[in-house]
């Protein structure tokens, strides 16, 4: 402790679990701000922040597969499609050969349609059916979760080369196709969820990278500052105080 390289905070994850997974809810069992999909009150709170009908998130109350489980199922031929971003799983997953295929039918990675977002060739892109060229961290706006749990905002320095795009652009383009024809109340589902940043008809963000990043950050801040959203505040002010205590 208190020696170089011996700090109390872990450098966790693939690639940054405290910044891109725990805080924003990309784990299969998590919602943003370390809330849990299995906790009904956490789901109601998240619905209030995202302006979703009560019960909308109940469909995900049973967590999906964690990473190792997902790759185990992939090796059995039970995963039809996998899309990876921000990590090089073919390099970092332990004993990858066990995922290449097992059992009489020898199913595995080669039976799964794999999409990889990357900036240069890696072991993961060698297994990919489709590689989407994306921007490096200096070629777009973004945040990074530091070991001491502060969030650092980094600014775009240069344009991405060629046809490379912000990862978020690829997610938006797939999302509006997946949600095509879906409604939340009387509103188009994609526009309800993402219309504040993205114009699906123009296939582009409504603002520049900096403003888009700011809008997303301000939305995320509500999870730890319910005063910014009256509906979320009402749920946070529970009678026994347990929910508010967990948030703090």
Where would I find each of the regions flagged by the language model?
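Domain-level signature for respiratory redox metalloenzymes
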Residues: 1-116, 121-248
């Amino acid at each position: 402790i208190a020696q170089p390289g011996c700090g109390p905070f872990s450098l966790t994850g693939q690639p940054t679990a405290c910044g891109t997974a725990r805080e924003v809810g990309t784990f299969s069992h998590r919602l943003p701000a370390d809330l849990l999909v299995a906790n009904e009150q956490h789901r109601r709170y998240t619905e209030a922040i995202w302006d979703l009908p009560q019960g909308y998130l109940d469909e995900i109350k049973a967590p999906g597969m964690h990473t190792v489980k997902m790759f185990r199922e992939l090796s059995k031929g039970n995963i039809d499609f996998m899309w990876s971003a921000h990590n090089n799983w073919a390099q970092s997953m332990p004993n990858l050969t066990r995922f290449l295929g097992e059992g009489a039918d020898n199913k595995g990675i080669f039976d799964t349609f794999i999409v990889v977002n990357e900036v240069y060739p890696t072991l993961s892109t060698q297994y990919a059916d489709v590689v989407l060229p994306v921007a490096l961290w200096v070629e777009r706006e973004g945040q990074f979760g530091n070991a001491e749990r502060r969030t650092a905002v980094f600014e775009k320095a240069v344009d991405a080369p060629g046809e490379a795009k912000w990862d978020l652009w690829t997610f938006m383009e797939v999302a509006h196709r997946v949600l095509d024809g879906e409604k939340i109340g009387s509103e188009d589902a994609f526009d309800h969820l993402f219309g504040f940043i993205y114009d699906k008809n123009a296939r582009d963000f409504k603002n520049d990278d900096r403003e888009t990043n700011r809008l997303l950050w301000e939305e995320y801040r509500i999870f730890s500052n319910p005063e910014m959203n009256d509906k979320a505040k009402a749920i946070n002010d529970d009678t026994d105080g347990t929910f508010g205590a967990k948030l703090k």
